[in-house]
């Protein structure tokens, strides 16, 4: 009898403890569901696309008023990688580990190193991509402001490429919110600049996808026409062929329309394609290893335009590395950055400068050209 009473008492305590634990677990699950619901609502509420055909502010006045014919000009395209990519940096979206630059000081060092390298070519025009304005991943360093201070003699403009909501992943170090731009610098005065919104996916993934754009900057030419500089950064992550095709189709139709008016077109940037179509094979001895690095669809390039592949000394050198592992010679590299010109522009020579990827996952691409 005493044993029976003991069992009832002990069993009752166990049942009570079990109920308490169950309530705690249910409360935790409910809290997680509530947090997830709030986050989803935040993402939906925060989502917006920057308007198309957005006029951009042109700042500062350069010394030259117009471009001239038959003069050699130098233009550099440089993806700065938001100041995070030292040679040993790996990025979680590429299969690596890190989601943010390691420190504010590292960001400043990388941007300064990139600007110094670009400036060493004494360029007439500069096209920068992945220039963060106020992003968690780059410790809120205003990189466009830094570039203005580093290139004080240039006229310049900036277009927000994407302004994405806070990404709570990876959970141990969230990537955070990203406000990033493309920036164009010129030592000849700009008359205007325009931001064009590129097509992106229509699926629900667009909520956390990156908005995309290109900018069109107008520079007077001595004969009354205009030189149009297209600064481009097309989609990579999470984009299918239809989105990439739609983006390039829009870009090329715009360029062709301006060329038909007699204007001069120079388009450069990060195209997130194997630019030559076979650089992956040439540089690595194998076909494309990564889904984002598809051959550039040359069939989309309109009549009257040339993809600039006349590399200095015929050398095929990389402009980009994959960031799944720290960089060392022999790692996977590819060409994704480059230039297109209209037929009234002569591409004299192009060179993919080798930096050892010390300050970015992209090398600068330098082109010399003439207006004919």
Where are each of the predicted segments found?
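Short proline/glycine-enriched turn/loop segments at secondary-structure junctions
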Residues: 205-206, 325-330, 354-358
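Metal-dependent phosphoesterases centered on the DNase I-like endonuclease/exonuclease/phosphatase
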Residues: 238-344
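Conserved beta strand-loop-helix elements of the APE1-like EEP
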Residues: 149-152, 176-193, 330-347, 370
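Surface-exposed cleft-lining segments at the edges of enzyme active sites
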Residues: 97-103, 131-133, 198-206, 233-242
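Short, Lys/Arg-enriched N-terminal segments with co-localized hydrophobic residues
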Residues: 1-14
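Active-site beta-strand/loop signature of hydrolases that rely on acidic residues for catalysis
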Residues: 74-80, 111-140, 185, 217-219, ...
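N-terminal, active-site-proximal structural segment of metallo-dependent hydrolase catalytic domains
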Residues: 11, 19-153, 158-179, 372
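A well-ordered secondary-structure block
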Residues: 163-227, 231
């Amino acid at each position: 009898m005493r044993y029976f009473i003991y069992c009832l008492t002990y069993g009752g305590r166990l049942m009570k403890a079990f109920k308490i634990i169950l309530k705690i677990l249910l409360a935790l699950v409910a809290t997680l569901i509530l947090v997830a619901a709030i986050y989803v609502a935040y993402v939906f509420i925060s989502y917006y696309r920057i308007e198309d055909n957005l006029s951009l502010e042109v700042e500062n006045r350069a010394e030259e008023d117009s471009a001239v014919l038959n003069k050699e000009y130098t233009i550099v395209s440089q993806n700065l990688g938001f100041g995070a990519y030292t040679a040993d940096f790996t990025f979680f979206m590429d299969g690596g580990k890190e989601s943010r630059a390691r420190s504010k000081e590292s960001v400043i060092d990388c941007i300064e190193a990139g600007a110094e390298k670009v400036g060493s070519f004494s360029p007439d025009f500069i096209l920068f991509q992945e220039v963060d304005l106020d992003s968690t991943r780059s410790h809120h360093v205003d990189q466009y402001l830094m570039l203005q201070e580093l290139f004080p003699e240039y006229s310049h403009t900036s277009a927000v490429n994407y302004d994405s909501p806070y990404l709570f992943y990876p959970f141990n170090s969230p990537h955070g919110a990203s406000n990033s731009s493309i920036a164009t610098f010129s030592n000849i005065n700009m008359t205007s600049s325009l931001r064009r919104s590129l097509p992106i996916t229509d699926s629900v993934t667009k909520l956390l996808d990156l908005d995309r754009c290109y900018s069109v900057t107008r520079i007077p030419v001595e004969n009354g026409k205009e030189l149009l500089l297209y600064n481009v950064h097309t989609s990579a992550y999470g984009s299918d062929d239809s989105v990439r095709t739609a983006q390039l189709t829009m870009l090329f139709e715009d360029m062709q329309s301006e060329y038909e008016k007699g204007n001069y077109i120079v388009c450069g940037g990060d195209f997130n394609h194997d630019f030559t179509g076979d650089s992956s094979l040439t540089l690595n001895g194998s076909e494309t290893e990564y889904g984002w690095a598809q051959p550039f669809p040359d069939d989309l390039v309109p009549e009257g335009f040339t993809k600039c592949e006349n590399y200095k000394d015929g050398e095929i050198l990389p402009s980009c590395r994959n960031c799944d592992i720290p960089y060392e010679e022999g790692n996977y590299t590819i060409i994704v950055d480059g230039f297109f010109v209209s037929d009234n522009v002569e591409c004299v020579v192009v060179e993919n400068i080798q930096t050892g990827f010390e300050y970015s996952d992209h090398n600068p691409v330098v082109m010399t050209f003439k207006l004919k």
